[in-house]
Amino acid sequence: MSKYTILDKINTPSDLKLIPESQLKILSAELRAFLVDTLDVSGGHFASSLGATELTVALHYVYNAPYDNIVWDVGHQTYIHKILTGRKDKLVTIKKDGGISGFPKRSESEYDTFGVGHSSTSISAALGMAIADRLQGKSSNTVAVIGDGAITGGMAFEALNHAGGIKEDILVILNDNEMSISDNVGGLSAHFSKIISGGFYNSIREKGKEVLKNIPPIFEFVKKIETQTKGMFVPANFFEDLGFYYVGPIDGHDVTELVKTLRILKDHKGPKLLHVITKKGKGYTKAESDPIKFHHVAPSFHSGENITTKISKPTYSNIFGDWICQKAAKDKRLVGITPAMKEGSDLIRFSQLYPHRYFDVAIAEQHAVTFAGGLACQGLKPVVAIYSTFLQRAYDQVIHDIALQNLDVLYAVDRAGLVGADGATHDGSFDLAFMRCIPNHVIMTPSDENETYHMLEFGYEYNGPAMVRYPRGAGIGAEITGSLDLELGKAKIVKQGSKIAILNFGTLLPLAKQLAEKYHATVIDMRFVKPLDKIMLDKVSQTHEIILTLEENCIAGGAGSAVNEYFVAKDLSNKIIVRNFGLQDKFLNHGTKDLLLAQSKLCVENISKELDKLI
């Protein structure tokens, strides 16, 4: 007999609605157990979904998705949503080749109303949907679910301001699992929340307002008293000042209370914000104790089977983490900045050693960059540790606030290139293209750990904005040397060959070497995308017939395009054959990195096919 007596009956939200409300608590427990069992096989985002279990159940129990729009932010917390919307049996394939995505994806399910992966987008998207439905005469409801981390993003506040200003009928649910506000979740607060979310209170409140509006002094006095009283327990003032009807905070693990509150709010028109308190990792003791560690789990995390203790090579993030700590010890001007990526960027040790020089600005990439500019103006040396995919969000600041003023800011760009299982929303496919066109920038593409370390040093000492891009995961095991012969805009010949020259930008150097062995080709580690080594390009164009460029970046506008532009300007494009190899002009699905590289023709087999046609 299955241990999922209720869950086995559910494949869609319609099935869920047939379950008696009294059994929703049991269902929530079964969902957690199913999540543990499944991710023990597949791995995936864990703690966030555990924390949002009851909220997800309540939403699909009360609302009629997909007719009603439920919009999720980021997507880490949506595994329960996927289970309840026809993907229960596919969850074991999550983030695998040919499996379902780790994030909501419109092409995957009609219940995934908006594709996400980046933060703070839900309220904007939900507002657009609500207005579109209203303009087309559709009587649907729209809900945005956003976490206390994601709501720190400026885009979320822009959307709140817009929605509140136009009084659009939309519900924003703030899923708050931040422990620092736990003191607010007490008897008085819970009692007050029940009162203000009740239909009787709402009715009296609104009718009373209509009467008192005819007596302005009394109306303003009562409104002020109500706001101040609520403000003693909840952060109502801010949201109500934006035009939202605020309810909460309520217990996000009391599924009965959630269902009751959502039903009431469903009938309350206008912009509403429901503040729910949840615990990340709820129901799994280890995840509750260490939600960061259990944010994402590997297969066998629960059973302990097949877990090895082999020592792996340091990741590129580890190389950065070592460098910044060592540099900070020597230079008190160094300041480290991250937009909510302390763990991922390996800034934990730096934050502990230099807490007054470490700034986690939350999910605020635009602010992070301009903040760095302000620090640089006053003589400090800011280092912005940021993922390639998130650097996109600060593009205007990179141009207007840093490059235009030629400020000393170093961008340590992590997760450059393909990231594998997280898919297109997190791939760092575009940074070379969108950064290369900006004046005053130095752009470096290290080929291994040693070059990464020394290019970070070079970029830090450079007088102006500089960028070092490096991929996710471990390198080749290159030893960090005491020094490296590194000169601005100068490439390095790795292997001398003939006829064919391979210009490598970044960590595809092992691939370049494999091709060189097969074709007796010259291999050049270009190191710099900006400035390019033009002397080297002139030499190569005079001594070789075929030139290949390799990069883990989009071909359009990337490093290879920079080489093409130079050869065209020198009127050499008709005298040599140039072929660019990089990421294709399409978004890739999630999968193993080797598979995705092969799909992008970045492998010996595919490049050989092209070369054989040219020789």
UniProtKB/Swiss-Prot annotation:
Metabolic or biological pathway, per its Swiss-Prot or TrEMBL entry: Metabolic intermediate biosynthesis; 1-deoxy-D-xylulose 5-phosphate biosynthesis; 1-deoxy-D-xylulose 5-phosphate from D-glyceraldehyde 3-phosphate and pyruvate: step 1/1
Gene3D superfamilies: 3.40.50.920, 3.40.50.970
Keywords: Isoprene biosynthesis, Magnesium, Metal-binding, Thiamine biosynthesis, Thiamine pyrophosphate, Transferase
Name of the protein in question: 1-deoxy-D-xylulose-5-phosphate synthase
Pfam families per record: DXP_synthase_N, Transket_pyr, Transketolase_C
Originating species: Francisella tularensis subsp. holarctica (strain LVS)
Name of the coding gene: dxs
Binding site for thiamine diphosphate: 76, 117-119, 149-150, 177, 284, 365
Keyword Nucleus: no
Molecular function GO terms recorded: 1-deoxy-D-xylulose-5-phosphate synthase activity; magnesium ion binding; thiamine pyrophosphate binding
CDD domains, per database record: TPP_DXS, TPP_PYR_DXS_TK_like
HAMAP family named among the record's database cross-references: DXP_synth
EC category: transferase
Catalyses which reaction(s): D-glyceraldehyde 3-phosphate + pyruvate + H(+) = 1-deoxy-D-xylulose 5-phosphate + CO2
Entry's EC annotation: 2.2.1.7
Keyword Transferase part of the UniProt annotation: yes
Role of this protein: Catalyzes the acyloin condensation reaction between C atoms 2 and 3 of pyruvate and glyceraldehyde 3-phosphate to yield 1-deoxy-D-xylulose-5-phosphate (DXP).
GO cellular-component term (any): cytosol
Cofactor: Mg(2+); thiamine diphosphate
